[in-house]
From Swiss-Prot:
Known role: Digests double-stranded RNA. Involved in the processing of primary rRNA transcript to yield the immediate precursors to the large and small rRNAs (23S and 16S). Processes some mRNAs, and tRNAs when they are encoded in the rRNA operon. Processes pre-crRNA and tracrRNA of type II CRISPR loci if present in the organism.
Residue ranges of domain RNase III in the record: 4-127
Keyword field contains ATP-binding: no
Keyword flag Nuclease: yes
Protein name (Swiss-Prot/TrEMBL): Ribonuclease 3
Gene3D superfamilies in the record: 3.30.160.20, Ribonuclease III domain
Species for this entry: Campylobacter fetus subsp. fetus (strain 82-40)
Predominant cellular place of this UniProt entry's protein: cytoplasm
NCBIfam families hit by this protein: RNaseIII
Cellular compartment(s): Cytoplasm
Residues annotated as domain DRBM: 154-223
Gene Ontology biological-process annotations: mRNA processing; regulation of gene expression; rRNA processing; tRNA processing
Amino acid sequence: MDKLNRLEEHLGYKFKNKTLLKEALTHKSMKSSVNNERLEFLGDAVLDLIVGEYLFFKFKDTDEGNLSKLRAALVNEKSFASISSQIRLGDFLYLSAAEDNNNGRNKPSLVSDALEALMGAIYLESGLEAVKKIFINLLESQYNNIDLQSLGKDYKTTLQEITQARFGVTPRYELVSSSGPDHKKSFEMAVFLNDKELARAIGNSKKEAEQSAAWKVLQGMNI
């Protein structure tokens, strides 16, 4: 259980029920009797409430429309994937060999779902306040400024700002390959800085693949 102990140290939370923790980390590709989809469903609802309450009290003079925009900027796949990187959540997941070989541990959708499942498991074991304490700490560590201006960015924009500030160069994205039928194509995009390839990623659209490639660069800052 050394692997799980390391994750608990990252979280600052000790699970009483290790089976529940393992369930939260088990992807459906494992084809086991349990996976983390039900806990993900629960965690999604819990985090929606926690972030909504957090914003309600933090921004006392902000109207409902802007509060909703702020919550949408924080409660989404990209945000949760970034937060997951703090605790290296992908390293602790139980995946099939095929999913692991397909870079599953670095897929934003997969680690985002696992974060929701993990928070759902903590909620079941210790209640709302425990989840709130852990998640808000992660949230505030990830985002120095929580406001509409700073949260309205995407991975490509963030990467471009960094490379322009450091090198005066804008990243370039190129299509590597595409596959599948017209109604269900997948695209592999590569991101370059000058002539150096920084990362590749696959998505259901070119835009999605570009975002995932930019995310990979930001996680490793492989520049």
